[in-house]
């Protein structure tokens, strides 16, 4: 750090011409070497000498004057903080002695009472390698200065005695002789020089002064020894330039209550407490550990506990309601197959919901429990007038179904289709009759109109679905045929309900077909539903066999009728959905779209769909994967339904079929093999046609259903 000083010394001996001002003053070199500080810089003789106009006398006079000034002052000047720009040229007048000014400065210590409190206990100041500010900060108020004269205010810290200290028995005592002193540094107030009027206008604070124990510090911090006592000193110098400090008159003021012992960690707990009580930045010593953020967190914890305690009984009540008050899904009144088209009947579901009075939060869990246990033990009765009526043994089985639905993995001992053999013969006999009934019932069964439910509470019916999965086939297609008028369709995060028969009418069959992806053949009846349950997923394959509303929880999504690229399954669920709810949602999306069609769906095709058990990579809801694959690239126009239809008729087939149920889901037919391949392709291509054309396409093709449904 002495190179700039040597350069400046050489300039001091350079002959200056009288008419020309000084080329570069001393401060220019110092600023170039250290922009903000003058760290421990001992100015050499001649560096601060005033240039003389006579070139011949410049060398000797400068050397003599500088030597005398340095001997008198004996100061090592250091500056911390910004000072006026020094690169500009200065005239010689800036270094001329000032006229005599009459002043009588008076200095008072700010926050004297706080200093006294610390002083009584023995003030401690922490020093660190990176530098630490003082607390209380050294702040004084000055009066009696000349308003027009310029003053430089400085501060330094000197050793108070020649001793080293230690804290023992709750008090400070001398521990030995002091260590060698560190380099002395003076802290020049950043506002210096300034007029007396400016200094007297407000307290003069040296709060930016930092203490360090780093001997090689290059930031201009004051270097101190730990466990030594120090005394701050305040200086007033009347000068209009910092370079005049060495030969200016210093007025020094000492406040005994400001002495302190430098420490690397606080020794006296009382001092620590005083700092905590008075210093808003003493975050490292608070009880909370790390300052205001943790303190704020601690303050919020009681309110969080109160909130949790307040919500706990509600959650407990909701869980008990979900387990005890929810009606079994099959108790919902089914729509008569021969009834005329009518809106969805939600009165019983709403009444049961009001009686339960459950909170809306556990709805996904309640839906999953209902739908997971709904199909277990259900099989359509032979009675043609009411195909979904249950016998008493089946009702008894259904009462036990929620418990079985909650634990799908525990029932896996019989294999994915382990329970099918118990009901196989009876279900196959029923299917032959049901296939004939469906052709006649499909003509009588109308299509239930679309009902948008605006009630915030959701009816907990068997056909409920916590989310609808849209496949990648929908990119660029219209969402709903009847609603495709070019306007966006905004769905409330509550329920969007429609009758099960409305899907084929609205061109929604391709949605369900693409969700289904493919299907296995297999025996019908409750055995297959339980078999899928044993496969690790709580299914609700026959959940929509009644005319219960079909809700879509499309929360936080705006679906435009022009068609928005939809994510695959799970993307439209409310975020915290369970695996059980997702599986039930998939199963609820699969059933055929009329009440009579759903009866046969309960018997066979839907509950055996490999959609729930397949290892389809993009369906992330299945925690238990069965090695049955479905090509994700399967197209809606895939043909080959003739061979797949024969597979669908086979009761024990577990082979994947690309799209045997495609057209069936699309047009609303309930059973496999109901359509010819050409009919399926035609309906897939014309999926957005009117309701009449779709229904009329069924009438000519359902005659094939009984023959192809028979097991091989």
Swiss-Prot record:
GO cellular component terms, semicolon-separated: chromatin; cytoplasm; nucleoplasm; nucleus; transcription regulator complex
Binding region for DNA: 109-287
Phenotype upon changing residue 132 to A: Abolishes binding to T site 5'-TTCACACCTAGGTGTGAA-3' DNA sequence
Gene3D superfamilies reported for this sequence: Transcription factor, T-box
Biased composition (Pro residues): 326-336
Region described as Disordered: spans on this chain: 313-450, 637-687
Keywords, alphabetical: Developmental protein, Disease variant, DNA-binding, Nucleus, Phosphoprotein, Transcription, Transcription regulation
Official protein name in the record: T-box transcription factor TBX2
Species classification: Eukaryota, Metazoa, Chordata, Craniata, Vertebrata
Gene name as annotated: TBX2
